[in-house]
Amino acid sequence: MARRRTPSCASIAVACAFLLAARAPVAYAAKPRKTIARELEKRYQRGKIDQATYDADRAVHADVKRTIRSLRGARRAELAGVLASVEGMAARGALRASRLYPLFLTLQRNREWWSSQPLLAAGQRVGFAGSELVWQYVPGQGLQLHPLANFGKLNAYAKGSRRNNARNTVLLDELMSIAVPRGGGLAWEYYLTFDGGRPPWVSSLAQGTGLQAIARSAEKLDRMPELLPRIQDGLKLFEQSPPTGVRVETEDGAHYVQYSFWPSLRIINGFVQSLVGLYDVAQITGDKRAAKLFADGDRAARAEVPRYDTGAWSLYSRDAITRESDLHYHTLLRDFLTSLCDRTDTDVYCTAESHFTGYLTTPPHLRLRTTRVRGGATRTLRFSLSKISRASVRVTAPSGRTVLAVAAGVVGRGTRSVAWRVPRRAGDYTVRIDATDLAGNPASIEGPVQVLKPKRRKRAAG
């Protein structure tokens, strides 16, 4: 775009001189940085929160800061990390009135834990007396609410004996209390930083499982008239595109993404389980929107699921990152597909479930790709395998002496290679490749590699 021309001072010297002389320097005040304290004050002054909430949250904030000063080492770092995360949300303008309860509950629980409770292992889950909520330890970010873990627990109560009804009720009410408005609907958000995604974010896996568990609980506890409107509000996330919601339109229907901050990453196990959740919500409540959202996702999943079958194992994700499942996620995907197969009797899901079950007892297929190398230099020894496995390579000389032994570790499917400093002595060497897949199925091959004499170096002239 061409720069706009303006009259120069030379052409209107008198006017410019007058204006420059008359104009006093203007000092612009820097815009105040958004902090927890300022955002609380703003919400209170604008009538978004009442006096009791304002006073209680200010007290929690002050207690956390005071406790941080009294702690040392890992305890101090964890509590400070939680506070920094909430401060970051405040700085980004995300500290809405509707989020204050779950966020200040997070601050309060972390202050309680790190003041007196044991240090934790990464991923360890804990609870507090008088509450059914599940908290998960995230190194550097302290204890965090974990929606999926909580909804898994709620599902267990809802499907279990009526002796669990009291605990089912407590957890259900606690989970409803931490739900927040999002995109015109209702969501259970994550407040931790994960894979570069800053909070707050949502997940189709957690949301779908959550609505399933709430619908089951509502039916079991005879609370459907009360909870159906909330369930319907929760469906809104499946109608909204990221980063607000989880819906990504495809040629076949709609894919529901696992992470709202990363819509190009397609994780199949989360998508499949979100469909199981939507299917159950539609069946339990009779809600037509839930049925339509399932149908939209079902059309996409029927096209997508076969693409995650490598012929020997399952893929965990595609598009932004394509990689194979580890054993846990392979089995989890198989189980989710079993659920979808049982509900829909759809050939695509039932076939994939059968394949993934079979792969758990099928050893990897190996093939030696390198058959000839020149001696006297470092060369590449290539081999291929059919599925992610722990592999090792051993080469023996014609004399029987081992000349290479490499533990390659866990490697993915496809063609792989190891570096080999090839001996100068020509002859037929033997390569042995051993591989054990993640389910413990072993395989091995042996094959010859011909080592050629090194090329003679040309003598320099004269």
Where are these predicted regions, by residue range?
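Short proline/glycine-enriched turn/loop motifs at strand-loop junctions of beta-rich domains
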Residues: L385-R390
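Well-ordered alpha-helical segments within folded domains of soluble proteins
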Residues: A80-E87, Y101, L143-K159, W201-E219, ...
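Carbohydrate-binding/catalytic loop surfaces
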Residues: A122-Q141, G184-S203, R247-N269, T310-L332, ...
